[in-house]
Each structure stands twice: as C-alpha cells, then as structure tokens.
C-alpha cells in the first residue's frame, strides 16, 4: 500500500457510494459499490484475501469514490460506471446474449419473421428461442400450417411461396382483412401454446384426405401434427398460469459465482442462461450488479414478472428492472427459484470438476514429459524463439510455463544487440547468454527445462551457452517443425535424438501449445519493433517532431500509411502544430516518390 492510498483511506466517509480502483496507468480496473465506503474500501487493504482478490489489490495504486444518497443510487451509478469504463476485473456478460425471437409485424397485412432486435411498438414478439436453429424450425412449421403473407411484394404480385401454397397473396386469395386477422390470431394462439384446436383441424383434414384417397396430402398433415408434438416435448411446462417470467438463481463457492436464468414464456421453459465469473464484493451485491447489466442490454426482453432469491433486496431490483419483482415465499414459485439455484450450484461444481480434471491432466503431462526425458518433473519450462525478416529488426522472445500453464508475468522480450544480418544461431546464443547469465548472477529462479524453437543446430548452441559458457546444469530440448510449420519432433539427449512422443498424448499437446505461444509472442513483438522502426526512419529529422510527438503519432495512427491517409486537421487534433504537420506530410510524400522512382 502506497502513501497516497494510506492518506485517502483516512478520509473515506461512512456513506453509501461507488469506488473506482486504478492501476499505475490511471486506468480504472474495478468499480464497486458499498453501503459504507469507509468499511468496504479499507477491507481491500487489510487482512488476507483469496488469490484473485490479492491479484486485484496488487494492481491498485490509487482509487476514487463517489458518495450517493442511498444504496439504490449507488447500484444505478455502479452499473453506469461499469458500462462506461468496462473495468477488467468487473463482471463481463457474454457477448452473444441476443437470442432470436419470432415477430409478427404490425403491417397492414402482417408477416412472421425472425429477429434478434426488439423495438418498442413494432409488432408482437414471441420468445426468446435458444438458438437460430430452433427459431427457424418453429417458423418453418408455421409456414407450412398457415398460408399468411411471407413476402414484401407489391399487392398485385405473387411470390415463390404462393406457388408452394404457403403464402396467400391478399389480392388473389382474400381481399377481406378480417381473414388475415383470424389467421394471425391463430398464429398467436399457436405461439402462446394454445394449439389443441389447430391439431384438431389438422387431424380432420388428414382424415378427410385419407377418405379421398389423397394419401400424400394426408401424410403432410400427419407430419405437421408430429412436428407440433415434437415442439411440445421440447418445452417443459414449469407453471400452470401461462405467465411470462424470468427466474433467477445463483450460487457462490471458492470466490466464484454462477447465475442461472430460466426464460419461461407462456408457462413453458424455453431457454436458460448461464454465467460464471469471479466476484470481489458481497455475493448479494455482485448479483444485483449482474441483474442491472443483464437488463441494461436492450435485447433482453423484460417479462411480466421476475423471480429472485430470498436473500436479494426486492426494492433494489425494482429500481433497476421495470417490471413486477417477486421473492416467492412458498409453493411452486419458490420451487422454481430453488431449481434455478440448484442448477447454478451444479454448473459451478462442473466448472470446478473440469478445472480439477484439467489440472490432473496437465500434471500428468508434466510427469510423463519428465519421465520421457529422464529428468526431474519440469514444473517450470522456459521456451525461446527468434523473429526477423532477412535480418531486419531482429528480436527474440521467452515464454514461461509453470505447472503446465502460461505465466505471462514472467514472459520476456529481447532486442538483438550484437548480431548483424540473419543469423538465428548467433541470435539464440546472445539471448540465452543474456538471460541465464542474469539468472546466475542475480540468483533468479532457474527453469527445470529450456526449450528452443529449432533443430539440432539451435539445441547445440543452447547447450554450449548453458553448459560450457555459464556452467549451468539445466536440461535443453528442441522443438522441430515440419514443412507445414507444425510441431513435429522433440529433440533431446547426448547425442541428440528424437524422443518418441505419441501425437495424441497430453505431453505432445502441452509442447505444441508452448511452441505456438512462444512463436506468437516473438512475432507480435517483431511487428511492434518493425512498425516503430518504420516510424522512426520516416519521421526522423523533421524539425519540431521529437520523441514524444513521434510516440503520440505511433499510439494514435499505428502505421505510416494511416498517417498518410489522415487529414491535416486529424493530425493537428493531437496537439501537433500546423507547420510540423505539413513537414510530416511532405516527408511521407518524398519517401513515397523515392521508392517509386527507377
């Protein structure tokens, strides 16, 4: 805890409000709310916490707070602040939350369409459906049963569906609008689950077709009845009152929360939504934040009722969700909330089980890798790769895997300093010497295994540096790729030989992941350096354009091409004088002409 935070903690009020934690860059990394700001904010810096909270606290170098008049006002403010700042430690709802709906348009002659966007007073909406496939299947069934208008053709034209008997053009079949009203009413009844009359009508038509020996038509009616029955079985009846409602349940364990939402429409469960995330506040408060974000998404249909668990404050929910909020006390409705809560508990336990299984598999892969190489269990693995284009802007990168997982805080980047031209062996020698001479000198943690990206030559260079130059006893292996640039062989031993490694083994997947990660990290760094060098060479020697302004241009425009495409006004908006902007544009033009001249 720094002195600034210590001083600010003394000044916190005993009031409700919101607090904003910031990192060393001044970026807001977490937004929270509190009934008592003094108690809540101080709690982050006192006592012990779980690992994820300790990680959050380790990044806090400053905080701000906003006092509110009430808990409700704090909740609303928190939701808005999260929406505006998108802090990395706050709850993040999944991006693919817009579910499909069936919509009856409010045109003079309505159509049935599928949409993911709800607009007020723009028609009647039914759903949501769990996915596009389900919505399309329901629509296809309706298209076969009801020949209502399916196109936007002018009233004096027919469409393709008319010739299939699935669209009754209103100027040809019926000019009476009352016919269309009855047809749309039938569709509404069907979508609301009142399909007994429709099934009876179809059954009568099937029997009539059979008596007329029109067996193909009778089979079509039979298939339609079967389709309705199938759709019925996919929708579990959860209540007898045919009400539209969302039912919330949540469960917390080991610093994680799972929220389950049951979408019940016309008394039938048609979809559920599951979200798992780490939480840092009280469980009830983070659940409220989740609900606020959930319904702030305009694509979430707000039903007639929302059921919430017993522990949640109804008034606070009512302040953020404009519908009837119910906290069931007994009977069927309470059982529905209990069912949502039970599903949340099961989903969270499944997550933990999968994590435990993954840990066991990864641990097994590390054990097996150590056994195959005849070394101690390689708990810490450091891997290296070079990146350059014909020797220009040469760089290297190191990634670290601890217990089979990437430890990104330990990743390192290297600019090659002593090598001229494309020489991978010399570059690898320089980087390994720089890395492990420092490990030796400063007593840093050494890896259990070093992996270099390359074949026999790279491994021999690495072993020469580690064993002969530095006198260290760290095992070195090489990962060799095939002609498709895919992980192919593991080289190890003295003399070097290919280690037999089953392609479907966990240890092979681990090595493949390590090689992909170090390659990605090296290439990304090389692009950054190359782009920066391109900036420097093009923008060097321009009067009035110093390092700070060049850095500003680099951050904003990313490339010289983007600067060339920008207007003078856009560049001046960064605080760069007009005369300097003109010099920049002239320099870019001159460079372009030089390259194009013979």
Swiss-Prot record:
Keywords: Cytoplasm, DNA damage, DNA excision, DNA repair, Excision nuclease, SOS response. GO terms for biological process: nucleotide-excision repair; SOS response. GO terms for cellular component: cytoplasm; excinuclease repair complex. Gene3D superfamilies: 5' to 3' exonuclease, C-terminal subdomain (1.10.150.20), GIY-YIG endonuclease (3.40.1440.10), UVR domain (4.10.860.10), UvrC, RNAse H endonuclease domain (3.30.420.340). Residues 14-91 form the GIY-YIG domain. Its main location: cytoplasm. Residues 196-231 form the UVR domain. It is found in: Cytoplasm. It comes from the Bacteria. GO terms for molecular function: DNA binding; excinuclease ABC activity. InterPro entries: GIY-YIG_endonuc, GIY-YIG_endonuc_sf, GIY-YIG_UvrC_Cho, RuvA_2-like, UVR_dom, UVR_dom_sf, UvrABC_protein_C, UvrC. CDD domains: GIY-YIG_UvrC_Cho. Interacts with UvrB in an incision complex. The UvrABC repair system catalyzes the recognition and processing of DNA lesions. UvrC both incises the 5' and 3' sides of the lesion. The N-terminal half is responsible for the 3' incision and the C-terminal half is responsible for the 5' incision. Belongs to the UvrC family. This is UvrABC system protein C. It comes from Streptococcus pyogenes serotype M5 (strain Manfredo). The gene is uvrC.
